[in-house]
UniProtKB/Swiss-Prot annotation:
SUPFAM superfamilies: Adenine nucleotide alpha hydrolases-like. This is Phosphoadenosine 5'-phosphosulfate reductase. It catalyses: [thioredoxin]-disulfide + sulfite + adenosine 3',5'-bisphosphate + 2 H(+) = [thioredoxin]-dithiol + 3'-phosphoadenylyl sulfate. PANTHER family: PHOSPHOADENOSINE PHOSPHOSULFATE REDUCTASE (PTHR46509:SF1). GO terms for molecular function: phosphoadenylyl-sulfate reductase (thioredoxin) activity. It comes from the Bacteria. Keywords: Cytoplasm, Oxidoreductase. It is found in: Cytoplasm. Catalyzes the formation of sulfite from phosphoadenosine 5'-phosphosulfate (PAPS) using thioredoxin as an electron donor. It is an enzyme of class 1 (oxidoreductase).
Amino acid sequence: MSVLDLNALNELPKVERVMALAETNAQLEKQDAEGRVAWALENLPGEYVLSSSFGIQAAVSLHLVNQVRPDIPVILTDTGYLFPETYQFIDELTEKLNLNLKVYRATESAAWQEARYGKLWEQGVEGIEKYNDINKVEPMNRALKELNAQTWFAGLRREQSGSRAHLPVLAIQRGVFKVLPIIDWDNRTVYQYLQKHGLKYHPLWDQGYLSVGDTHTTRKWEPGMAEEETRFFGLKRECGLHEG
């Protein structure tokens, strides 16, 4: 696998970019998660960043990448509506793993947004998408720009939802390389990694949550529900960060 030219790839149409990365992805599929991280750090350009929602399995990718690249900026987009347990989990993992946490927020406070737009999450798909654009997408775009990111690590897994089922290890999103080291992990592999390294699930895991985002758009799992139905009232799975 040769060193990839980000600028040249960004000049290509999306379909051609996918084709240009196909051979590299075929090789990365054969590597384990640690090998993928090491390959990316050796072959892809910096600056490097890692994003995390500090959700149910967040400790895995935070530990995996941070142990190889200590002090890598960890981007959190904070909506102001996270669960209290999530904020506590953020503090706990930041201290335990000595994370270089970078918190980004919308330019408008949560209260100001409600005054201007009402409760966007109660306004159907269009409202949810506007909410996500304001609170997730714009802050992430700003983070990538301010941190001069060229390679972005994230902890997505194909098993999590249909929208992630066919994601490759390596892609280009928002003009930067995006690397998904644990994309092919199942729940058992996640559990084993957490156990091996003395790490915990998000505190709400024990209360029946399979996925955790904002308080107003997250539901406990109930028998018969798919994991993606626990977020955004089942109207959509992605918050916008990992789309486009």
